[in-house]
Amino acid sequence: MSFGKKEYWEDWVLEEEDEVFKIMKAAYDAGIRTFDTANIYSAGVSEELVGKFIRKYEIPRSSIVIMSKCFSPVRKDLIKLYMDLSSRGVQLHDSPELANQCGLSRKHIFDAVQDSVKRLGTYIDVLQIHRYDPHVSAEEVMRALNDVVESGKVRYIGASTMRYYQFIELQNTAEKHGWHKFISMQNYHNLLYREEEREMIPYCQKTGVGLIPWSPLARGLLTRSIDANEETIRSKTDLYTRALEFGAGYKAILSRVEELAKKYNVSMATLATAWSLHKGDYPIVGISKVERLQDALASVTLKLNEEDIKYLEEPYCPVPIQGEI
């Protein structure tokens, strides 16, 4: 999501190809082998950059994992409309402009996969459904996903951003028919939002579904002090950041992240990501600078003890369900 084109996405997107490839190459050289993107990110430009990176550096295809997503529209003229309607809770199927341009119908899944493979220039290792679609039957969704795997264009399927009961419905449908099931769940989970720990995460852990949460740093809020006056382009313009709600323990959590980061002489970002890794997650991190990559890599070697974990989690208070925009 961090790479693409400002015109098609957000002002904080990195669009200079040399800088993008510099970060991706640094990640690859450091041992990072999984790259997560989506067809909607910058109207497909993000996927194109992943494909260009592989070809530019002649990366052996078998050495990396490419994850992409389908659900949303990709046409440049429809993305802003889609984002606006989604943020206001408007039913997407009520918009004639979005007919057959988004959702999880068999037609749209097939079209989305075909276009993503073309932009990437290769197959997709893990195709994730970006959202749950209440207007398409579980049978249609899971059969279509099974068929794109059987076609060879996709190797595995994953899910993202949905309620526990919705995920269960889809998994059970696939199991009933002997179709391919989801191997991963990309949900919203971090120190400021832990509602997924009630049902989704225990289920995934019990059934062997990999957890790869998005926004482990809560849209960057876990990277700076509560008293910091720093305002980034993203914090001022990001639709999702403005939609977040926090519990009564929000300030205490940030304060404790800052305190422990100083104790271990690491950044707050490193500390917060280390917590995510400790919970058994494999978080998706967005990187726009090489220095931020170093913060993420440092989290792998930072081992928090149980006292640290308890101290960080203690102030948490329940909050409304989020992350489904």
Curated annotation (Swiss-Prot):
Keywords: Oxidoreductase. One of its GO terms (molecular function) is oxidoreductase activity. It is an enzyme of class 1 (oxidoreductase). Pfam families: Aldo_ket_red. Its EC number is 1.1.1.-. The keyword Chaperone does not apply. Belongs to the aldo/keto reductase family. Aldo/keto reductase 2 subfamily. PANTHER family: ARYL-ALCOHOL DEHYDROGENASE AAD16-RELATED (PTHR43364:SF15), NADH-SPECIFIC METHYLGLYOXAL REDUCTASE-RELATED (PTHR43364). This is Putative aryl-alcohol dehydrogenase C750.01.
